[in-house]
Amino acid sequence: MDGDTICLRHETDDDRTVFITQVTDGKFSFSGETSSVTLCHIWTKKNPQNTVSFFLEPARITVELSLTPERNRVSGTTINNTWQQLNDSIQLLGQEVVRTSLLPMADSTTQMLRVKTIDSLHRKMSDCILNTARHNSDNPIGQYIKKNYKAPEFK
């Protein structure tokens, strides 16, 4: 990733890049001051689909931007550690959904069991998100989820 350009934007900036920096010796950094907590997105110009979301706040935040999204990490503050835990949970459940959906076709009873398994995994994902919001209702994660997440209407 050396020499690649790292882009950062606040979620509220309508897809405008706010800051850019270069990767040198496998590392990059941004510095500045902020008085509020804002959800931000960071990506490389060479691979803009590989985006990491994190909460920018007055603290030192570590973002590990890997070549593959599942290895991306964010840490360094209570809010970002919680955000990473939520993302890890959703990612694990999502991988299980994909694994289950890619199993070879089987008889109708087995297929119905797989559909129920996938439905159960989707419910667990929703529960993870809603529980994170509930446990963090007094901070930006809970407020962000409450504002932006609509729980599915499971049947």
Model-predicted regions and their roles:
Residues 138-152:
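Amphipathic alpha-helical repeat scaffolds of TPR domains
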Residues 1-132:
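A non-transmembrane, solvent-exposed segment enriched in polar/low-complexity residues
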